[in-house]
Design a protein with these regions (language model features):
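Conserved beta-hairpin
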Residues: 1, 142-159, 176-179
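Conserved N-terminal entry element of GNAT/NAT acetyltransferase domains
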Residues: 1-8, 14-16, 78-97, 239-245
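Short amphipathic alpha-helix that is part of the acyltransferase structural core
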Residues: 18-27, 87-124, 245
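Acyl-donor-binding surface of acyltransferase catalytic domains
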Residues: 25-97, 230-235
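Conserved acetyl-CoA-binding loop-helix of GNAT-fold acetyltransferases
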Residues: 28-38, 172-175, 181-194, 198, ...
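Conserved GNAT acetyl-CoA-binding A-motif
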Residues: 42-54, 167, 196-208
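A short helix-loop-beta-strand connector motif used in the catalytic cores of GNAT acetyltransferases and
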Residues: 44-46, 70, 125, 135-146, ...
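Conserved active-site alpha-helix within GNAT-family acetyltransferase domains
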Residues: 55-69, 182, 186, 198, ...
Length: 245
């Protein structure tokens, strides 16, 4: 028995109400692809996620078997971490009382993600996914959540996860639409990097959508540089199950 080709995603399956798994390899040949498909059918999988390297042979093999390309992913990295500066007065760590406001922002801030780009997923559930995501992040799933406060309310967030060894990743970034273009993103980033600089972290990475030029520009302005590209595919086995209503 070699390494498993797929892993079932219990949380995703419960949330969306369909059986979801993720492929482990990032490159496949014809035989490996067919073994993955056989496993999914035997396990009753409805949807398979596949994060593929930007490899022509892998892409062709997947697309020949009805894998749908739902996102082109860009990875960006910051290394070394710049010296910490004092956080802005409006920037602080998230607290319980911020969650309601952050959930509202999250529901409308991530429409470029692969879930919205797959019509099998109901858009209302996608909105709820990001509400839950920021909620869980504030409850400890993320190692740190930075917020900017204006007029007594949190109007933006940025989540940070510590990775081993000596690395961190930035997850979600969102700003209330009525407060955009006011420098809030820069304050969030400064607050995040100030916290990260005290955590023995040597590099920070993030991933965003290739079509999301604004997001890439935000990170590049902070000193991040592109380091890799990959492609998210979804393969549905039961098109009518979990389809958006």
């Amino acid at each position: 028995q070699g390494a498993p080709l797929c892993e079932r995603l219990d949380w995703d399956s419960r949330f969306f109400g369909v059986s979801i798994a993720r492929a482990v390899p990032s490159r496949v040949d014809l035989l490996t692809r067919d073994a993955i498909l056989d496993w999914c059918r035997a396990q009753g999988i409805d949807c398979l996620y596949f994060l593929a390297d930007e490899d022509a042979d892998t892409m062709r093999v997947l697309e020949d078997a009805a894998f749908s390309r739902v996102d082109d992913r860009v990875t960006l990295e910051l290394q070394p971490i710049p010296p910490a500066s004092s956080p802005h007065a409006d920037t602080r760590a998230a607290c319980q009382s911020d969650i309601a406001a952050l959930r509202k922002i999250a529901a409308v801030s991530h429409h470029d993600s692969r879930f919205y780009n797959d019509r099998h997923f109901d858009r209302g559930r996608c909105d709820e996914l990001y509400r839950v995501w920021i909620d869980r992040s504030c409850q400890g799933w993320a190692d740190h959540v930075v917020v900017v406060e204006r007029d007594g309310n949190a109007v933006g967030y940025l989540t940070v996860h510590l990775r081993e060894p000596h690395a961190a990743s930035i997850g979600l970034v969102g700003v209330d639409r009525t407060y955009r273009r006011q420098g809030i993103g820069a304050h969030l980033m400064d607050g995040a990097l100030a916290w990260i600089s005290g955590q023995s972290v040597r590099r920070v990475w993030t991933a965003t959508q290739r079509r999301n030029v604004a997001s890439q520009g935000f990170f590049q302005k902070a000193g991040f540089r592109p380091t890799g590209r990959a492609i998210w595919y979804h393969r549905w086995f039961s098109p009518s199950t979990g389809a958006a209503s």
